[in-house]
Amino acid sequence: MKAKKSGKSSGDQVAGKPVSASRSEMAEVVLPAQTNPLGKLLGGHVMHLVDIAAAMAAHRHSNSYVVTASVDYIDFRNSVSLGEIVMLKSQVNRVFHTSMEVGVEVYSENVLTGECKHTTTAYVTFVAIDEKTHRPKPVRPLILETPDEKRRYEEAAERRKTRLALRYGT
């Protein structure tokens, strides 16, 4: 499926939505219950936050319920310390038929110095679910507006190819 160039619908087609409409951000302070004995945010908690931030972007794009289908990649680059602010930014990278890939970037901010660092990158695939039948449903096209969005769109196709090859052994 190719990205639509405009948001106009023709016939039965649902109008596309720009990537910017899916962008989501969330943040929270890292508390003691979320850290390991070294005072670092637990990786499992980061994964939980990634899933929530990614789902928000998928909901915004599809205007439907979504379920997590896979986490293709998660890279922990830097740790997040107790008392820091953890910030997550997500956006839909590509739409397939009933699924969509969402990219998530995680950052930490030291509240004393203001220093921000990129800590984690993840790619999560969601399936849109019909609210009545609870079955997968088609997702509206994605409108690409910037060179970065086009790059992410192309890279998502490669990740999908790898994911499907691993899943089906081809």
Question: What annotation goes with each model-predicted range?
Answer:
Residues 13, 19-21, 41, 52-89, ...:
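Hydrophobic beta-strand-centered segment that forms part of the acyl-chain substrate-binding groove
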Residues 18-32:
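Short amphipathic
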